[in-house]
Regions:
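Pyridoxal 5′-phosphate
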Residues: 1-153
Length: 153
């Protein structure tokens, strides 16, 4: 936030309020409330269990593919499955998956610099599941990565 001091000038506040926006996005606030109500109706534990099951299915399937290296660590893992494929950059995997109508994202070492440096991580693929995904969608990703991996040889 700032004080408007003239037609072509303003003075920024010296405190943290300088980072506040004046306007509020009421539609987003209402949407957040509706989304929270919906999640509570579905059940947070049910959502958690579903995400865990789908992510475990994906990790198991990807882990069985020659050349795939799963990059997830930790005792409790989330619905974001990170992996790489030997000899193919993550951006190439993402591009190849687009032909299968599968969307993933790519995370470069700079997005998690300390962890990437410590673990020697390359650019990695991030495949995310949510409770509304189906087993068939997870299997389609696994099958597509299997085909992409087979073309490496």
């Amino acid at each position: 936030a700032a004080t408007w001091t003239g037609p072509d000038s303003y003075k920024l506040r010296p405190d943290a309020k300088r980072f506040e926006n004046w306007e509020n996005n009421y539609a987003a606030r209402l949407g957040l409330g509706v989304a929270a109500d919906y999640a509570l109706r579905v059940g947070l534990q049910e959502i958690w269990d579903r995400i865990q099951a789908l992510a475990a299915r994906m990790r198991k399937g990807l882990g069985a593919i020659d050349g795939v290296v799963l990059r997830d660590i930790g005792a409790t893992q989330c619905g974001i499955v990170t992996f790489s494929l030997e000899d193919i950059p993550a951006s190439g995997i993402k591009e190849s998956l687009m032909a299968y109508d599968i969307n993933v994202s790519v995370s470069g070492p700079s997005s998690t610099l300390l962890d990437a440096m410590r673990r020697g991580l390359p650019e990695i693929v991030r495949a995310s599941v949510h409770y509304y995904n189906s087993e068939a969608e997870v299997d389609a990703l696994i099958d597509a990565i299997s085909e992409i991996s087979a073309k490496r040889n």
